[in-house]
């Protein structure tokens, strides 16, 4: 076995917790865990710990929850742990230059894309949104830029025609820990080979918004079907009927030309709700009216057929 490293782990959501879990089984010494402060969640707005905090406390690890790492006293928390390396996975706080330089081997990050493609906040969703054939994880050495550091290790996986951001997230949550453990071994052995990112290949994965997820019928059916998968499970593609938002969970493309204006309902039957787009027909298969559970088009038509009269246009 390689040298056992003293590791600080910094992360917040379930995706990060899966990486911490792998680290704890790897023989390395996790000396401290940084995660975001508890946040109000649920209907009662009760303060809830992050998945990383829950796991760290279960395992008896010291947990730190600073609001920022800019204050000197919070940076001292990192320095006092005398770590060999800091592993950062979906932490959500900026690491100042002073913190990046504290561990002997620096700070490394698990990023959910094949860098330099999709630097930024929403790499999983944007890879689907753009119609990429594959994605993966990149383990990189962190610097002060946004996902600009040297790449240490990559693992890729295909994006299938059925993938949603939810299923891709799960795939990358399996790949990430594998890549992380391999990278740590290479760092410990001195065999890591940093690779500079090619700036000519950079794309940016901008944050998603609920407004962006509103269905724009002027786009092609193929684009819309992809966006529906990219925005599932958040923020969810949606359309508005009688001033109510209706989420769309699943749709398919019917490769038939139509002269109808985009947004025109062509048919509504047990096969789905067929709507004209800027190019081709989108068949809505699973929808969720406000305050209800997701249901098949057939079930929605049974209760709300007046919403989907052929010839009418959806906004």
UniProtKB/Swiss-Prot annotation:
GO cellular component, one term: cytosol
Catalytic activity reported: L-methionyl-tRNA(fMet) + (6R)-10-formyltetrahydrofolate = N-formyl-L-methionyl-tRNA(fMet) + (6S)-5,6,7,8-tetrahydrofolate + H(+)
UniProt keywords, alphabetically: Protein biosynthesis, Transferase
InterPro entries noted in UniProt: Fmt, Formyl_trans_C, Formyl_trans_C_sf, Formyl_transf_N, Formyl_transf_N_sf, Formyl_transferase-like_C_sf, GART_AS, Met-tRNA-FMT_C
Gene Ontology molecular function, alphabetical: methionyl-tRNA formyltransferase activity
S-S bonds: none
Protein name: Methionyl-tRNA formyltransferase
Organism (species): Shigella boydii serotype 4 (strain Sb227)
Underlying gene: fmt
